[in-house]
Amino acid sequence: MIVAKGLSKVYGEFRAVDGIDFEVHRGESFGILGPNGAGKSTTMKMIAAVSKRTDGELTILGKDPNLKGPEIRAHLGVVPQKDLLDRELKAWENLYIYGRYFGLSKKFLKPKVEEMLAFAQLEEKRNSKVEEMSGGMQRRLAIARGLINEPEILLLDEPTTGLDPQARHVLWDRLFRLKENGVTTVITTHYMDEAEQLCDRLVVMDKGKIMAEGTPAGLIKDYSSKEVLEVRFGTDRNEATAPQLATIAERIEVLPDRILVYVEDGDAALEKIHALGLRPVTSLVRRSSLEDVFLRLTGRSLVD
Amino acid sequence: MSDLKFVPGQAVNVRHAMRVGAFRVAEYRLRNMAKWWDAIIAFGIGNPVLYLVSVGIGIGALVDHSTGGHGIGGVSYLQFVAPALLASAAMQGMSDEVTFPVLEGFTWSKYFFAIGGTVISPKQIVNGIYLAAFVRGIWTVLTYGLILLAFQAIPMVSFFPLILSSLLAGCGWTAVMMAVSAHIKDDDGFFAIIGRFVIAPMFLFSGTFYPLSQMPIYLQWIGWISPLWHSTDVGRVLTIGQPTQPWLMVVHFAYFVAMFIGGFAFTYPVFARRLAE
Amino acid sequence: MITSIATSMAVRIAEKRAGKFGSGVYSGRAGQLVERNFLAFKSSNWLVVISGFVEPVFYLLAFGLGIGKLIGGVTDGSGHTVSYAQYIVPALLATSAMNGAIYDSTWNVFFKMHFGKIYQAMLATSLGSLDVALGEIGWALLRGLTYSIGFMLVVAPMGLIPSWWGLLAIPGATLIAFGFASVGMGMTSFMKNFHQMDWINFFMLPMFLFSGTFYPISVFPEWIQWIIRALPLNQAVELIRGLTLGNLNLAMAGHALYFVVMIAAGLFFTTKRLTALFMS
Ligand SMILES: Nc1ncnc2c1ncn2[C@@H]1O[C@H](COP(=O)(O)OP(=O)(O)O)[C@@H](O)[C@H]1O
Ligand SMILES: [Mg+2]
């Protein structure tokens, strides 16, 4: 449904998106994972057919956004990073008016607005203004708004950034439901748990470039070990202990506050550390995550 | 818990949507304006009544008294200022509906970017905003004109030509203000500056309260570039039979048209650029 | 380092004032707010600042010189005839004091309350709500004072201030601004949206047009005159006009008292409201 080849966006001298290739297929949930400033929003705006690409090729729903912007946008649902809701209007009016922009009739929109309010679990807030709603509710309203034209593709730019954990889970639940209904979605995020939860397939993006592509499980398999042992020796001693740890694992990462030891069996590795006569202050064994993939690819963590 | 059941991509009739875009933006603006209906009605009626009473029995009394009851050019002072007040109200009422919304849309709530994500093109946003302002303009000149009639400040026969020429001045001025607003990155006292350096002098020095020729020559240029003066001049020809020349009337209307075209010409590309950022 | 000094100072002040009357709302640090506004002001748009000064000058040019020619002289309160320009200069001074004070204490404050959320942050420190009210109003006065001095510097050389008493018009305008700013800020603290803010302008316009600014109120029937006399702008115009034209009379003490009451009432409600809004 979306094909990008060598897609670039240059602001002045700065290459915000630097020659990326990817494809999004019908019915899948596609993710773009990357830290702040990676170029996710810029990519999204090009896919949304509002921002013109500087270079490369981009086809959305079989059309070129430079030539057929309105036609493409007619079948997209957009949930921008900042919600961009109209603060003067009530919840239902925000949905209704947005539907009108797509040329939809009052007859069509009347039941549709109620359906979307129900989907976003905002029936009670139907007549509230945007200010009177929590951040999570506003985001759900923005998602409902993005779905009002029954789009082929829904674009979500950092849908849960700035929300508290509970609001995030409510939102994830809604997005799962969308997936079950066969809506194609593109999601950007800098949360690795979100990417693991919501995406069938994803690309890891950093500094305008794509570093890797695959399924969450596949990426972890390719770029990390099965388990990770996190040990802390105290801030001043981590660095000194590192060389010794390197002998028991194929790879380690020294972070300012802890050391990550990449191994197949975490508990066994911990025993080996004890056998070396080292006594970490704390230790923790966990499964590898996309965070580790990112660290491996860029040498930095996702959230700074 | 509810589920969504739809076949993606079926609901929108693209060609229809692209055709009606501007009207849908106007619909949005009018709905938004309707939330302020009480203020719009109060200003629409209160403003002219207050000015007419104040000028009519206040300043007018002083002027008419000191000119021996002849006012200016043989008409009462109220009749002299009436066309200027009407044109000024049309310009102000209409332009308010582009300046604030444009700043709101680009800078405050950034709602234009949401509209820009739909079928609607930047050009259609411009047209829609303007269309809604035009509706406000019609309302303003109609109410103001009727109140002028009630105060016997204008003759009945000149009612329609007068409100029409005022509306034209409003259209030209509003297009210019739309272009100015589109260029504003952050407001930073924008309205205070425009209000005090542009609108206030224009209101005061456009031959509004006394003939332009009475002003020192070094201030008269304000009148010549001011749409308010052009409109007032047309209005006085229509209402109090002020003598004129055909070429001057042509200049007046050409000026409105030029502002209208120029305003749009400087607005369209800015909207297109800013929405694509 | 600086923060630790500031903190220890705040604590000292809080301790000093603890138990004193009004300690919950006032810590004697309103100056901090004025200082903050001054810093913000230095980086703000200078055109906006100048614009507050040019407005009355424009009106003077248009009405005083333009319409003045049509009108000739006006009889002032004591029966003397003065030129039209001399007649409206004090009114313009009073009006610009009002406009400036209202602008600073309504729109400005409204923005800070609802968008900048500046007060929440301030009231979380040792500042009390009266500090905020006084500081904000003090700032409005400082600006107003600058404008009135500037205006006087323009009109006095033109011979439009016939009396030396006119010098007192500057503190007079400051008193007027204080009154409007206190009440304006009190009203603003009750406003919830722009819509309501718009109504402030709606009530300012008739006040401007009818308060004896451009013509004597004697043109109106007696009962309307009494309504006008009750309006603060008419009180202000009468006060300043008495000073610049040198017509001193006892009624002026009444006008001054009017503003003292306005100030007290305005401060009382603003403090109460800010406390209820942010500190409960
Ligand atoms: N309109 C713009 N003009 C100039 N630079 C921009 C613009 N938009 C984004 N950038 C820059 O491009 C980079 C990528 O931004 P963005 O796509 O928003 O990143 P992300 O969404 O991944 O956090 C950032 O460094 C940002 O500063
Ligand atoms: Mg982003």
Give residue ranges: language-model regions.
Chain C
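Hydrophobic transmembrane alpha-helices and immediately adjacent juxtamembrane helices
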Residues: M1-L167, P171-S280
